[in-house]
């Protein structure tokens, strides 16, 4: 399985399917590619904020692929693209993979309109991975750790709108994955963080932290 971090909370995960999560490229000051450079089979949106959903419609229209998101967000998008709605606790079978929606503690709007609950996603592909979305740590992570057991987790570390490094360490202590990948940091000054701090402290928990460069391909 290949993982590419496009910056911020945007990832391409290429396994049995090519999954694109939270596309934010055109407005991302750190982005190294354009939305038209992206390929995918499906887009997952954790919530509707511009820095997570900004390029979803353009990419979905060009590739003629569906966007999976919370019900209220899909209601706002379905006039423009094919959508798949979901909510917390729900699982969608998309060809050879399973996509489960779980809780995230944040907010969600799209172009100023209410967009439902924010989500995290647990995807069962060649390996199981958990993209936490924008969130703080929360008690449901204990259930995710016990029953879902994701091997790979992507967690925000930038603070201000989400967890910071110290809170992400608490989340990792709960989740106990094999591998963690930090996200949602250094895109803007208000979310400045050093992922090396996470790597150093997580090693004491026996968790490997991989810090990819933007557009670096990681085989896991």
Curated annotation (Swiss-Prot):
Coiled-coil region(s): none
Keywords: Hydrolase
Pfam families found in the cross-reference section: Lactamase_B_3
Gene Ontology terms, MF aspect: hydrolase activity
Domain of life: Archaea
Entry's family note: Belongs to the UPF0173 family.
NCBIfam families per the UniProt record, alphabetical: PRK00685.1 (NF001911)
HAMAP family the record matches: UPF0173 (MF_00457)
Name this polypeptide is given: UPF0173 metal-dependent hydrolase PTO1118
Protein's organism: Picrophilus torridus (strain ATCC 700027 / DSM 9790 / JCM 10055 / NBRC 100828 / KAW 2/3)
């Amino acid at each position: 399985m290949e993982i590419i971090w496009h910056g911020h909370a945007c990832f391409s995960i290429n396994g049995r399917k090519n999954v694109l999560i939270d596309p934010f490229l055109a407005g991302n000051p750190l982005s190294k590619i354009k939305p038209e450079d992206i390929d995918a089979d499906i887009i997952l949106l954790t919530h509707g904020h511009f820095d997570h959903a900004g390029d979803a419609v353009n990419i979905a229209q060009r590739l003629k692929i569906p966007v999976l998101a919370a019900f209220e967000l899909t209601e706002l998008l379905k006039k423009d693209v094919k959508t798949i709605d979901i909510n917390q606790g729900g699982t969608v079978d998309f060809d050879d993979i399973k996509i489960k929606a779980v809780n995230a503690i944040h907010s969600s709007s799209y172009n100023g309109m209410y967009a439902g609950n924010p989500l995290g996603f647990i995807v069962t592909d060649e390996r199981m991975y958990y993209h936490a979305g924008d969130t703080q740590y929360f008690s449901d992570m204990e259930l995710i750790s016990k029953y879902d057991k994701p091997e790979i987790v992507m967690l925000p570390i930038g603070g201000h709108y989400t967890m910071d490094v110290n809170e992400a360490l608490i989340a990792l202590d709960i989740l106990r994955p094999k591998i963690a990948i930090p996200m949602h940091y250094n895109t803007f000054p208000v979310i400045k963080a050093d992922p090396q701090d996470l790597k150093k402290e997580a090693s004491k928990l026996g968790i490997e932290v991989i810090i990819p460069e933007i557009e670096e391909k990681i085989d896991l």
